[in-house]
Protein backbone atom coordinates (compact mmCIF):
# COMPACT_ATOMS: atom_id res chain seq x y z
CA UNK A 1 0.00 0.00 0.00
CA UNK A 2 1.30 3.42 -0.92
CA UNK A 3 1.06 6.26 1.59
CA UNK A 4 1.78 9.98 1.44
CA UNK A 5 5.22 9.47 3.00
CA UNK A 6 6.09 7.41 -0.11
CA UNK A 7 5.39 10.41 -2.32
CA UNK A 8 8.42 12.24 -3.60
CA UNK A 9 7.39 15.49 -5.21
CA UNK A 10 9.80 16.46 -7.94
CA UNK A 11 10.39 20.21 -8.07
CA UNK A 12 9.09 21.69 -11.29
CA UNK A 13 12.45 23.33 -11.94
CA UNK A 14 14.21 19.99 -12.26
CA UNK A 15 13.43 17.17 -14.62
CA UNK A 16 12.02 14.01 -13.07
CA UNK A 17 13.81 10.75 -13.82
CA UNK A 18 12.32 8.81 -16.74
CA UNK A 19 11.18 5.17 -16.60
CA UNK A 20 9.69 2.87 -19.22
CA UNK A 21 7.70 -0.15 -18.05
CA UNK A 22 6.59 -2.69 -20.66
CA UNK A 23 3.35 -4.58 -20.10
CA UNK A 24 2.29 -1.99 -17.56
CA UNK A 25 -1.49 -1.98 -17.97
CA UNK A 26 -2.02 -4.89 -15.52
CA UNK A 27 -0.34 -7.00 -12.86
CA UNK A 28 3.27 -6.54 -11.80
CA UNK A 29 3.91 -4.04 -14.59
CA UNK A 30 1.03 -1.83 -13.49
CA UNK A 31 2.11 -1.94 -9.84
CA UNK A 32 5.71 -1.16 -10.82
CA UNK A 33 4.68 1.79 -12.99
CA UNK A 34 2.41 3.12 -10.25
CA UNK A 35 5.11 2.83 -7.56
CA UNK A 36 7.66 4.62 -9.75
CA UNK A 37 5.19 7.40 -10.63
CA UNK A 38 4.30 8.02 -6.99
CA UNK A 39 8.01 8.21 -6.17
CA UNK A 40 8.62 10.99 -8.67
CA UNK A 41 9.35 9.24 -11.94
CA UNK A 42 7.91 10.29 -15.27
CA UNK A 43 6.65 6.83 -16.29
CA UNK A 44 5.99 5.74 -19.84
CA UNK A 45 3.59 2.82 -19.99
CA UNK A 46 4.62 0.71 -22.99
CA UNK A 47 1.48 -1.30 -23.73
CA UNK A 48 0.17 -3.26 -26.71
CA UNK A 49 -3.49 -2.31 -26.10
CA UNK A 50 -4.02 1.44 -26.43
CA UNK A 51 -7.32 1.45 -24.50
CA UNK A 52 -6.03 -0.71 -21.63
CA UNK A 53 -2.93 1.48 -21.49
CA UNK A 54 -4.99 4.67 -21.31
CA UNK A 55 -7.12 3.15 -18.54
CA UNK A 56 -3.94 2.30 -16.60
CA UNK A 57 -2.59 5.84 -17.10
CA UNK A 58 -5.83 7.27 -15.66
CA UNK A 59 -5.66 4.94 -12.63
CA UNK A 60 -2.02 5.78 -11.95
CA UNK A 61 -2.53 9.52 -12.30
CA UNK A 62 -5.53 9.31 -9.95
CA UNK A 63 -3.40 7.39 -7.43
CA UNK A 64 -0.70 10.07 -7.65
CA UNK A 65 -3.28 12.74 -6.82
CA UNK A 66 -4.68 10.70 -3.92
CA UNK A 67 -1.39 9.61 -2.37
CA UNK A 68 0.44 12.89 -2.86
CA UNK A 69 -2.48 15.03 -1.75
CA UNK A 70 -2.97 17.01 -4.93
CA UNK A 71 -6.00 17.19 -7.16
CA UNK A 72 -3.98 18.76 -9.95
CA UNK A 73 -1.38 16.34 -11.34
CA UNK A 74 0.63 19.21 -12.83
CA UNK A 75 1.22 20.55 -9.31
CA UNK A 76 2.70 17.20 -8.34
CA UNK A 77 5.22 17.52 -11.14
CA UNK A 78 5.02 14.04 -12.60
CA UNK A 79 2.59 11.71 -14.28
CA UNK A 80 2.35 8.57 -16.32
CA UNK A 81 1.92 8.49 -20.07
CA UNK A 82 1.08 5.85 -22.66
CA UNK A 83 3.27 5.06 -25.62
CA UNK A 84 1.98 2.04 -27.59
CA UNK A 85 4.39 -0.88 -28.04
CA UNK A 86 3.89 -4.36 -29.46
CA UNK A 87 6.92 -6.53 -28.71
CA UNK A 88 5.71 -9.04 -31.32
CA UNK A 89 6.57 -6.50 -34.02
CA UNK A 90 10.08 -5.27 -34.74
CA UNK A 91 8.55 -2.31 -36.61
CA UNK A 92 6.57 -1.35 -33.48
CA UNK A 93 9.70 -1.60 -31.32
CA UNK A 94 11.72 0.58 -33.70
CA UNK A 95 8.88 3.12 -33.90
CA UNK A 96 8.58 3.19 -30.10
CA UNK A 97 12.31 3.87 -29.68
CA UNK A 98 12.33 6.54 -32.40
CA UNK A 99 9.38 8.33 -30.77
CA UNK A 100 11.01 8.04 -27.33
CA UNK A 101 14.35 9.45 -28.51
CA UNK A 102 12.58 12.37 -30.23
CA UNK A 103 10.86 13.32 -26.94
CA UNK A 104 13.49 12.44 -24.32
CA UNK A 105 17.26 12.52 -24.05
CA UNK A 106 17.72 10.31 -21.02
CA UNK A 107 16.26 7.04 -19.75
CA UNK A 108 16.88 6.22 -16.09
CA UNK A 109 15.05 2.89 -15.79
CA UNK A 110 13.84 0.33 -18.32
CA UNK A 111 11.62 -2.40 -16.86
CA UNK A 112 11.19 -5.29 -19.30
CA UNK A 113 8.05 -6.84 -17.85
CA UNK A 114 5.70 -7.63 -20.75
CA UNK A 115 5.07 -11.24 -21.58
CA UNK A 116 2.53 -13.46 -23.24
CA UNK A 117 1.64 -17.12 -22.92
CA UNK A 118 0.85 -18.30 -26.41
CA UNK A 119 2.27 -20.84 -28.77
CA UNK A 120 2.23 -21.72 -32.41
CA UNK A 121 1.50 -18.36 -34.00
CA UNK A 122 4.26 -16.81 -36.07
CA UNK A 123 4.83 -13.04 -36.14
CA UNK A 124 5.16 -10.90 -39.26
CA UNK A 125 8.91 -11.06 -38.56
CA UNK A 126 8.88 -14.86 -38.90
CA UNK A 127 9.42 -15.81 -35.25
CA UNK A 128 7.20 -17.75 -32.87
CA UNK A 129 5.09 -15.10 -31.10
CA UNK A 130 5.92 -16.07 -27.52
CA UNK A 131 9.66 -16.23 -28.26
CA UNK A 132 9.61 -12.83 -29.99
CA UNK A 133 7.38 -11.10 -27.41
CA UNK A 134 9.05 -12.48 -24.31
CA UNK A 135 12.68 -12.56 -25.39
CA UNK A 136 13.79 -11.18 -28.76
CA UNK A 137 11.50 -8.13 -28.56
CA UNK A 138 12.86 -7.10 -25.17
CA UNK A 139 16.41 -7.66 -26.40
CA UNK A 140 15.87 -5.35 -29.40
CA UNK A 141 14.08 -2.75 -27.26
CA UNK A 142 16.93 -2.73 -24.75
CA UNK A 143 19.60 -2.54 -27.47
CA UNK A 144 17.89 0.44 -29.11
CA UNK A 145 17.49 2.25 -25.76
CA UNK A 146 21.07 1.75 -24.52
CA UNK A 147 22.21 5.19 -25.80
CA UNK A 148 19.46 6.86 -23.72
CA UNK A 149 20.32 4.71 -20.69
CA UNK A 150 23.99 5.70 -20.97
CA UNK A 151 23.01 9.38 -20.89
CA UNK A 152 21.59 8.89 -17.38
CA UNK A 153 25.07 9.47 -15.95
CA UNK A 154 25.22 12.63 -13.85
CA UNK A 155 21.42 12.96 -13.69
CA UNK A 156 21.01 11.56 -10.18
CA UNK A 157 20.78 13.88 -7.19
CA UNK A 158 22.77 11.54 -4.98
CA UNK A 159 26.54 11.46 -5.54
CA UNK A 160 26.36 7.75 -4.76
CA UNK A 161 24.87 7.07 -8.21
CA UNK A 162 26.30 10.05 -10.10
CA UNK A 163 28.61 8.04 -12.37
CA UNK A 164 26.14 5.26 -13.10
CA UNK A 165 24.11 4.79 -16.25
CA UNK A 166 20.42 3.95 -16.28
CA UNK A 167 19.11 0.66 -14.95
CA UNK A 168 17.65 -2.29 -16.85
CA UNK A 169 15.29 -4.57 -14.93
CA UNK A 170 14.27 -7.84 -16.62
CA UNK A 171 11.33 -9.73 -15.17
CA UNK A 172 10.55 -13.34 -15.90
CA UNK A 173 8.22 -16.06 -14.72
CA UNK A 174 7.99 -19.79 -14.34
CA UNK A 175 5.25 -20.21 -16.94
CA UNK A 176 7.77 -21.75 -19.32
CA UNK A 177 7.37 -24.93 -17.25
CA UNK A 178 3.77 -25.24 -18.43
CA UNK A 179 4.33 -24.83 -22.17
CA UNK A 180 5.05 -27.92 -24.25
CA UNK A 181 8.04 -27.69 -26.55
CA UNK A 182 7.21 -27.31 -30.22
CA UNK A 183 10.41 -27.53 -32.25
CA UNK A 184 8.61 -26.61 -35.50
CA UNK A 185 7.88 -23.07 -34.29
CA UNK A 186 11.34 -22.48 -32.81
CA UNK A 187 13.13 -22.57 -36.15
Please state what every model-predicted region is:
Residues 2-187:
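Rossmann-fold NAD(P)H-dependent dehydrogenase/reductase core
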